[in-house]
């Protein structure tokens, strides 16, 4: 993988959020979608992290943080606080030539 051909942090967040919006209707409960849409403006967010260790339980490849990022999408109790109502955790390959993503949805 090429370290010089990676998505920026902003591009990674934007791409993960776009994928979330595209697939949420098929993977989230309608009540959760309504809540997210009503509250996102005030309490919503997407946060970028190195991949959590538990991804190894869900995927069969190395989630090297040089090439993968985890984006947590959800709602916080108030603006500026940490997301505590997680709607999706998106594992995204940051290399531009490899379109790989895996999502753990709210149950």
UniProtKB/Swiss-Prot annotation:
Q: Which Gene3D superfamilies match?
A: dsDNA mimic, putative
Q: InterPro entries in the record, alphabetically? A: dsDNA_mimic_put (IPR007376), Put_dsDNA_mimic_sf (IPR036763)
Superkingdom classification of source: Bacteria
The family line of this record is:
Belongs to the putative dsDNA mimic protein family.
What is this protein for, i.e. what is its function? May act as a double-stranded DNA (dsDNA) mimic. Probably regulates the activity of a dsDNA-binding protein.
Descriptive protein name: Putative double-stranded DNA mimic protein YE2228
Q: Which organism is it from?
A: Yersinia enterocolitica serotype O:8 / biotype 1B (strain NCTC 13174 / 8081)
